[in-house]
A protein has these predicted regions:
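Gly/Thr-rich phosphate-binding beta-strand-loop-beta motif of the actin/hexokinase/Hsp70
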Residues: 1-22, 55-58, 152-193, 198-201
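Short, intrinsically disordered, charge-balanced linker/junction segments flanking boundaries
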Residues: 1-4, 81, 222-227
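Switch/connector loops and helix/strand junctions flanking conserved nucleotide-binding motifs
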Residues: 2, 29-30, 64-68
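N-terminal phosphate-binding loop and adjacent alpha-helix
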Residues: 15-46, 79, 223-224
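Phosphate/pyrophosphate-binding loops at sites that engage ATP/ADP/AMP, CoA/4′-phosphopantetheine
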Residues: 41-54, 133, 204
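Active-site neighborhood for divalent-cation/phosphate handling
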Residues: 54, 58-153
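Small-residue helix-packing motif on alpha-helices
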Residues: 79, 204-205, 209-212
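Adenine-nucleotide phosphate-binding core of ATP-dependent small-molecule kinases
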Residues: 209-227
């Protein structure tokens, strides 16, 4: 999916256009996923007339290491040094092999930071796909964090606890918010797993199972839902 935003005179983001393209999530075609993505992004860029625009995109939470760390009371000038030390302790790869960043969490009772990291070669592959589509990279975000920022931008700080469930093809992101605190977890289960289960149960192809799921699937809204 690609969306085009513009900044209003008041500084708010305004959605100008949006489009999406389907990618086959068949595990048997996993080797072609990068090429599928490149073609899809290129087609979207052409339809939305993006030219050689710089884009901001989000990476699946499953592909990124995320860790929340508490920081002791320190001077603001020493925060980056301390977070770097924490990253060295928690990131499961040498820092010279990853691209990483952090963000301080506003409003927490204790000073807290969220650290995100991705292997450099993995990010290069994703950037390569974007660049080969004729676009350039402005910023890279992590899907759960982008979801959090989008929710806060639209609804502000929730008064009650909120759980957002973002179900993708291969990965689902869980985002739990309580006051100013939030917690994320990415699990390697998504819509493709349901499609694969249908294909196995009825002895049909993945593509046929996907069609059946979309055409005939029903969502169970639970006993508490009033028709």
């Amino acid at each position: 999916s690609v969306a085009v935003f513009e900044t209003s005179k008041g500084g708010d983001l305004v959605l100008k256009s949006y489009d999406s393209e389907s990618i086959v999530a068949d595990p048997a075609l996993e080797a072609s996923r990068i090429s599928q993505s490149r073609i899809a992004i290129g087609d979207l860029a052409q339809r939305l007339k993006l030219g050689k625009s710089k884009v901001r995109y989000a990476i699946s939470g499953q592909a990124v290491f995320t860790r929340f760390v508490k920081l002791p009371p320190i001077q603001a000038d020493n925060v980056e040094q301390l977070v770097t030390f924490e990253a060295q302790q928690h990131v499961p790869f040498p820092l010279e092999e990853v691209v990483w960043d952090y963000e301080l969490i506003d409003g927490a009772a204790e000073k807290e930071a969220v650290i995100v990291a991705i292997k450099g070669d993995a990010l290069d592959e994703i950037n390569g796909t974007v660049n080969e589509s004729g676009l350039a990279t402005a910023e890279v975000d992590v899907a759960p964090m982008a979801l959090y920022n989008a929710f806060r931008a639209a609804y502000g700080q929730p008064e009650e606890s909120v759980l957002l469930v973002d179900i993708g093809a291969k990965t689902s992101n869980l985002l739990y918010m309580e006051g100013t605190r939030f917690f994320t977890r990415s699990v390697p289960v998504g819509g493709a797993a349901i499609t694969a289960a249908i294909a196995k149960e009825y002895h049909i192809s993945f593509l046929d199972a996907e069609h059946q799921k979309i055409s005939n699937g029903l969502v169970g809204l639970g006993a508490g839902y009033d028709q």
